[in-house]
Amino acid sequence: MSDIFTRRVCLRLDGMDAVTVRRDLAYGPDRGLRLDLYYPPDKRDGCWPAVIIVVGYPGTLEPRPTALPYKATGWTVSMCQLIALSGIVAIAYTNREPVADLQALFEHIHECAEPLRIDPARVGVIAASGNVPTALTTIMQDARRTPVCAVFSCGCLLDLDGATDVADAALQFGFANPGNGRTVADLRRDVPLLITRAGRDQFPAMNASIDRFIRQGLVENLPITFVNHAEGPHAFDLYDDSRTSRIIVRQTLWFLRQHLRSED
């Protein structure tokens, strides 16, 4: 997986490379962080729904796994393009501290909604792999800002039933684990979730946490949509250019449209 930072999502659609992008807008308490906005090609008036591509690794992480900021990686750029083509603004950003800066970004969207042309009442989140624990903080009952919906792709969720898979992976790979000690009971019940799973995931923590989360989430009757790519490896949307992978990416875009676009 040495090329994981440059690979693009396996689904290609006409017009992806032509979406409008506003780059390196300042946000954060000291205005020292940057965000990119990918806009739908439709030139209509008014505000758009939006999706935040959540970053769960500290921007100060050393050693740096790549010279690219997460907002410039192949997965992020291509996913933002696909989201924009779906009629939703996609937001990619830089950070220093994952949880605090994600909350700062939410606040910025609410405070600057009009000039950004974003409807702050229709914001979702999407996160993959080790970025998922940070995204989970937004759907906790004590979260200051909550998304309308959330997509968690092949990622670590919560350590439940005494497990330590997520905590161990966070120590190994360096991602934030703000959900340590939390349970499914801490989650809101009104945020629809799409959870995707790679049946052949090479990283045991991912499916171990997903499987426990799904079991307990169903007991608690959470609004979960679950998709399992039985033969998919980790990051199958990058490494498995198959019909199944492309269908799941399309399902992801459909899920976001259904929950964020008022006209659908």
Predicted features by range, described:
Residues 62-74, 204-205, 241-244:
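Short, flexible/disordered intra-domain loops and linkers
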Residues 149-150, 155-219:
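The feature captures the conserved acid-bearing segment of alpha/beta-hydrolase catalytic domains
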Residues 1-46:
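N-terminal cap/lid segment of alpha/beta-hydrolase-fold proteins
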